[in-house]
Structures are given as structure tokens and as C-alpha cells.
């Protein structure tokens, strides 16, 4: 069983991630994790915070000399800006005289539309949005990317699975239909200012970001994640919570600001007749194959052996320089929302986070299917499973 948790606040000393159930023998380093976190900071339209706030990676358990031990993996992602927040975000009681006059400690009483502020204040009984927004912040995804790096390494080394993402829509701009990057395209995607594989669309996306920034506004978009080398048989049809497409949808919807998930050509299939919506099956020299992959590599909640393909729709960031209308909860009077420092667009980064989430779900399913004591055991079990397939 593979499971994980994160802890920590946006302006706290660190985020912490704990990943349990990782097989022994996965090769991964601090440098690799730092590299993935650097990818999370990519993208045209990011805010000033990305320029000066650094992720300080420390592996504090589960590895020795760059190899997992089979015990829980614990990763600390330190916040280089912590000294500025040490008093305001201190976990222990602080004398009121130390807090007096600190602008960062001023109560945030004007909740932002579209953010967790108001709902969280109501649920947990806070009169200040700070305790809510600190945890609701997308900063938490740094911890997900950290453990997602371990999951990617496991998938690659044990099963030969590679995960890649790209931006397919940003604002009103979309890439050419049918553009499907392979893992070999990863560096080229990351080199693009918006992690877009379509150069012409990327230019228009940059202009869209510039226009939104000029208007003190924000933008959303759509990212696509593909996983190659996924064997048939991960997931199950027998219970609702074992269907892999449901688990992927849950994982992707849990990412901050994600409002929709599509498996394969889901929305287009809904508009099509059955005769052109499904993937016909044909015999080949290497076994049965599907002519197309409209299903996105999943049928009945089970992987088909075709490339897995999912999309996630991200709404525009809810913290705007052009603040929206709200209510000051201390007075009950109309007000403009608080304006926390934020990005114009974080869609490229959402793709990196979505990769991590897809990898974690696939790694969990792989441990369920092929065992989890060691990478060697998983490889052996995968080979035996594929050799014994009744239908190839």
C-alpha cells in the first residue's frame, strides 16, 4: 500500500511530505527532487515570489546513499523566506509586544472570492483568513512534487513508465488538436515559456498573459498529462473506489484551482455517436491493440496498455491585483478583497504538479498489482504477469 501526506503552511518554516510504501531499491537523489521543484517554478506569468523564494530540500528518512530502503520516505522542503515570517507564523505563543505594528500580522478580514478564505473561516471559526490561506495556498504543491519525484523514479525504474505534461489551453488560446508529446519532448516543453509544444500557440499565450497582467487580471487554462509504458491491468472495475480513472480524477481535482478533469477524449466522446467514440480492437503481430486511444488508456477503470492521457482545467487565480468585491467580516460592510502577492498565470506549473499526482496514483496502483518490497521484485512480478497474460 502506497500512501502519503503533506504538512506545513505557505509562510511557515517548511513543508513536510511523508511517503509510505515505497519499495526498496528506488534510486533518487536530493538533486533530482530539487530539479523537479525548479520545474514547478517555471512559466511565464509567475509572480515575484518565484524569483526570491527558494526551496531548500532535505531528505530526512527512507533513503541511504541515494537508494530507498523500503521504509517511509520523509522530505522537508524548507522556505528561504521563513526569517521574515518567524514571528507572525511562530508555532509557539508570541508576546503581543513583538507582534504590535507588524504589517504581516494584520488580520485579513476581507475574504477573496474564489479562494478558500470565507468557507474556511466559517468552517473553522476564524475571524482572520490567515490560518486558512496559509494551508490552502498552492505552495503546498511543492511537497506533492517532492514525493511525486520518488513515485516517478519508481515507475520508471521498476515498470518502464514515463510521465510527461504540457499546456494545451491558456485563456482563449489552444494548441493544435492531437498534439501528443512523448517523454523525449520533456526538455523542449520545459524550455518554452508556457510549457507549450505548439510554438505558434505559445506566442499567442504569452500575449494573452501580457494582456491580463496589463488589466491587473489572471488567467486559467488546461494541462494534459500522458503516461507511456503503462501495462494493462492497473486498477479494477469491481468497486467504485478501485477504478483508476476515478482515482486519477480525485487526485487531479485535489490540486489547488483545478475545476475539471477529462479522461482521454471524454468531452468530445459525449458529443459523438458510439460508432466513432470508441477505440476499435485489432490483432497485430505483438498482440491485440486499439486503433485509436480516445479512451485515454482506461476502460472500465482499468488500464488498457495504451498511453494514459488525462487533462485538468485550472481556473484563473483568485488573488487579483484588481480586487473583486467582498465583505469585511468585522464590519459587515462591502469592501474590496485582500490582495495577496500572486501570479498572473500558474498553468505551466499546474502541469508539473499534475505529473506528480498522476505518478503517485500510478505508483500506488503498481504496488497493489505487483507487490512492494523491492524494485527487483516488482520487475520480476511485472515480467511474470505479462508473460502469463491469457489475452495478449
Swiss-Prot record:
SUPFAM superfamilies: Chorismate synthase, AroC. It comes from the Bacteria. Its EC number is 4.2.3.5. Keywords: Amino-acid biosynthesis, Aromatic amino acid biosynthesis, FAD, Flavoprotein, FMN, Lyase, NADP. InterPro entries: Chorismate_synth, Chorismate_synth_AroC_sf, Chorismate_synthase_CS. Its cofactor is FMNH2. FMN binds at residues 135-137, 256-257, 300, 315-319, 341. GO terms for biological process: amino acid biosynthetic process; aromatic amino acid family biosynthetic process; chorismate biosynthetic process. One of its GO terms (cellular component) is cytosol. NADP(+) binds at residues 40, 46. Reduced FMN (FMNH(2)). Homotetramer. This reaction introduces a second double bond into the aromatic ring system. NCBIfam families: aroC, PRK05382.1. Belongs to the chorismate synthase family. This is Chorismate synthase. The gene is aroC.
Amino acid at each position: 500500500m502506497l500512501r502519503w501526506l503533506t504538512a506545513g503552511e505557505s509562510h511557515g518554516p517548511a513543508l513536510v511530505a511523508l511517503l509510505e510504501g515505497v519499495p526498496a531499491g528506488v534510486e533518487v537523489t536530493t538533486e533530482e527532487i530539487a530539479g523537479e521543484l525548479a520545474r514547478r517554478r517555471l512559466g511565464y506569468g509567475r509572480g515575484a515570489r518565484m524569483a526570491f523564494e527558494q526551496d531548500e530540500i532535505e531528505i530526512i528518512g527512507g533513503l541511504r546513499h541515494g537508494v530507498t530502503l523500503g521504509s517511509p520516505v520523509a522530505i522537508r522542503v524548507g522556505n528561504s523566506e521563513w526569517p521574515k515570517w518567524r514571528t507572525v507564523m511562530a508555532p509557539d505563543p508570541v508576546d503581543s509586544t513583538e507582534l504590535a505594528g507588524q504589517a504581516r500580522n494584520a488580520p485579513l478580514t476581507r475574504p477573496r472570492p474564489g479562494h478558500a478564505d470565507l468557507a474556511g473561516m466559517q468552517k473553522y471559526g476564524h475571524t482572520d483568513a490567515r490560518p486558512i490561506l496559509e494551508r490552502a495556498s498552492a505552495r503546498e504543491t511543492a511537497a506533492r512534487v517532492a514525493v511525486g519525484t520518488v513515485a516517478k523514479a519508481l515507475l520508471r525504474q521498476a515498470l518502464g513508465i514515463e510521465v510527461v505534461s504540457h499546456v494545451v489551453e491558456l485563456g482563449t488560446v489552444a494548441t493544435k488538436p492531437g498534439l501528443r508529446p512523448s517523454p523525449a519532448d520533456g526538455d523542449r516543453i520545459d524550455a518554452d515559456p508556457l510549457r507549450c509544444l505548439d510554438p505558434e500557440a505559445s506566442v499567442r499565450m504569452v500575449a494573452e498573459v501580457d494582456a491580463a497582467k496589463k488589466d491587473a487580471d489572471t488567467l486559467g487554462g488546461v494541462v494534459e498529462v500522458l503516461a507511456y509504458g503503462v501495462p494493462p491491468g492497473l486498477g479494477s472495475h469491481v468497486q467504485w473506489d478501485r477504478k483508476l480513472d476515478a482515482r486519477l480524477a480525485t487526485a487531479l481535482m485535489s490540486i489547488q484551482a483545478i475545476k475539471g478533469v477529462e479522461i482521454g477524449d471524454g468531452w468530445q466522446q459525449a458529443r459523438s455517436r458510439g460508432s466513432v467514440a470508441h477505440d476499435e480492437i485489432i490483432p497485430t503481430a505483438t498482440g491485440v491493440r486499439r486503433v485509436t486511444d480516445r479512451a485515454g488508456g482506461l476502460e472500465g477503470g482499468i488500464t488498457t496498455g495504451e498511453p494514459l492521457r488525462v487533462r485538468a482545467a485550472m481556473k484563473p487565480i483568485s488573488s487579483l491585483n484588481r480586487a473583486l468585491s467582498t465583505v469585511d467580516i468585522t464590519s459587515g460592510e462591502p469592501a474590496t478583497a485582500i490582495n495577496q502577492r500572486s501570479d498572473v498565470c500558474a498553468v505551466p506549473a499546474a502541469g508539473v504538479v499534475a505529473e506528480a499526482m498522476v505518478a503517485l496514483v500510478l505508483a500506488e496502483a503498481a504496488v497493489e498489482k505487483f507487490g512492494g518490497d523491492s524494485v527487483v521484485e516488482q520487475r520480476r512480478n511485472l515480467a511474470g504477469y505479462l508473460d502469463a497474460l491469457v489475452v495478449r
